[in-house]
From Swiss-Prot:
This is Maturase K. It is found in: Plastid, Chloroplast. GO terms for biological process: mRNA processing; RNA splicing; tRNA processing. One of its GO terms (molecular function) is RNA binding. Usually encoded in the trnK tRNA gene intron. Probably assists in splicing its own and other chloroplast group II introns. Its main location: plastid. Belongs to the intron maturase 2 family. MatK subfamily. One of its GO terms (cellular component) is chloroplast. It comes from Tilia americana (American basswood). The keyword Cell wall biogenesis/degradation does not apply. It comes from the Eukaryota.
Length: 502
């Protein structure tokens, strides 16, 4: 956030009104390029336009934008466009990347002022995404039902632009955003992003999505807090609404008229709400009747107040003791762990059967094998195959790629309660690496391993195993009891590709 303070030369009292001129500043594109370098890729390297950014191209783009009376961009005419010429896709992505940095400035400056001791007016101190892990460990096993919610997309792109009006008061910036959205995507491509979205910056879409979700989440949390004095556990990225608290009085009147008869069913102190990306869960210890009320409340709120098409099938009610919840790349459920205790009292003995609830987190092995199959590491049955596209690289480069993928998978899924599936994935990657090297050297797998020896596979030892061997005593390290438990790493949220296997 210091980078914004260094470069911005805008009046502090009018920063929100003059964001559009920043699109003509070279440092904005440099910041956008730095953001692009921080992405974490799992299976493939970044081969997009981001590695072609240069100061000469940026200057050429700014000069052309400054000389034109109208910003004419056409994604359907990449070769004949008089404005961008043959570099239409590159320039288009540069503009969207720069604009993604610009629209984040008001929110970033608000965080900077808060870190400097200035009070942020009436903002919620909501918990971060990392609060999901203690929630799963401490609270999840005590709950009975969960609502598995797929958050719907807006039915019209204008809704995304309207959501930013609370943030950006610069009409020119909003017009540029509206023009770009209508030019490069329609409703179908926005819901299932394909090639048309590849030239539009994903960071910008993530910002627009979060700002839109905050609209109805703020109302939901307000109603949730009115029905219970306990705060809900929220793990999404929320953006403060400037004028929300000025409308609370109106919202109370609206919900009083429309939901008065149902509010008494919502008074549940054990409700927990968590959102991550396009999914949300609402977990409760109460009955299925309460969860049905919440289900239809969500659907009505989306359809009648935010004009988003939603069906009741997008909100599923699952009983945790019978179904698994697919969330954050894990299949989580609550299973009963039976135990038998013999109690001796004088001459009489009693056998007491006791069942304790225990959190069970499993790896979705089928979807992971499907992802490895798409990346050509194995076939659809999970049998390892060679990676022919990497056979032209050096041996060290091939090994480094496989080791990086194996460590990322092991690092992310270290929170699994059953490690057998993880060992199978690591076996697929190890054998695929050996087959790729054997293919390169025109040898068999058996002969290649015999020549290199068993030390060859030591590269696949995960990073955490080396760390634990240094930190913990040898008695714990050799007993291997440490690895049977769940270990949550706070940096796994950076491995975005593992959350959505499909």
């Amino acid at each position: 956030m210091e980078e914004f303070q260094v470069y911005l030369e805008l009046n502090r009292s009018r920063r929100h009104d003059f964001l559009y001129p920043l699109i003509f500043r070279e440092y904005i594109y440099a910041l956008a390029h730095d953001h692009g370098l921080n992405k974490s890729m799992i299976f493939l390297e970044n081969q997009g336009y981001g590695n072609k950014f240069s100061s000469l191209i940026v200057k050429r783009l700014i000069i052309r934008m400054d000389q034109q009376n109208h910003l004419i961009i056409s994604a359907n005419d990449x070769n004949q466009n008089p404005f961008f010429g043959h570099n239409n896709n590159l320039y288009s992505q540069m503009i969207s990347a720069g604009f993604a940095v610009i629209v984040e400035i008001p929110f970033s400056l608000r965080l900077v002022s808060y870190s400097q001791g200035e009070e942020v007016a009436k903002s919620h101190n909501l918990q971060s995404i990392h609060s999901i892990f203690p929630f799963l460990e401490d609270k999840f096993s005590h709950l009975n039902y969960v609502l598995d919610v797929l958050i719907p997309h807006p039915i019209h792109l204008e809704i995304l632009v309207q959501a930013l009006r609370y943030w950006v008061k610069d009409a020119s910036s909003l017009h540029l955003l509206r023009f770009s959205l209508y030019e490069y995507c329609n409703l179908k491509s926005f819901i299932t992003p394909k090639k048309s979205i590849s030239i539009f910056n994903p960071r910008l879409f993530l910002f627009l999505y979060n700002s839109h979700v905050c609209e109805y989440e703020s109302i939901f949390l307000f109603l949730r807090n009115q029905s219970s004095h306990l705060r809900s556990t929220s793990s999404g990225v929320f953006l403060e609404r400037i004028y929300f608290y000025g409308k609370i009085e109106y919202l109370v009147e609206v919900f009083y008229n429309d939901f008065q008869n149902n509010l008494w069913l919502f008074k549940d102190p054990f409700i927990h709400f968590i959102r991550y990306q396009g999914k949300a869960i609402l977990a409760s210890k109460d009955t299925s009747l309460l969860m049905n009320k919440w289900k239809y409340y969500f659907v009505d709120l989306w359809q009648y107040y935010f004009y988003m098409w939603s069906q009741s099938g997008r909100v599923r009610i699952n009983q945790l003791s019978k179904y698994s919840l697919d969330f954050l790349g894990y299949l989580s459920s609550v299973r009963l762990n039976p135990s038998v205790v013999r109690s001796q009292m004088l001459e009489n003995s009693f056998i007491i059967d006791n069942a304790m609830k225990k959190l069970d987190t499993r790896i979705p092995i089928i979807s992971l094998i499907g992802s490895l199959s798409k990346a050509k590491f194995c076939n659809t049955l999970g049998h390892p195959i060679s990676k022919p596209t990497w056979a032209d690289s050096s041996d060290s480069d091939i090994i480094d790629r496989f080791v990086r993928i194996c460590r990322n998978l092991s690092h992310y899924h270290s929170g699994s309660s059953k490690k057998k599936s993880l060992y199978r994935i690591k076996y697929i990657l190890r054998l695929s690496c050996v087959k790729t090297l054997a293919r390169k050297h025109k040898s068999t797998v058996r002969a290649f391993l015999k020549r290199l020896g068993s030390e060859f596979l030591e590269e696949f030892f995960t990073e955490e195993e080396h760390v634990f061997s240094l930190i913990f005593p040898k008695v714990f390290f050799t007993s291997r009891k440490l690895y049977r438990g769940r270990i949550w790493y706070l940096d796994i949220i950076c491995i975005n590709a593992l959350v959505n296997h499909e």
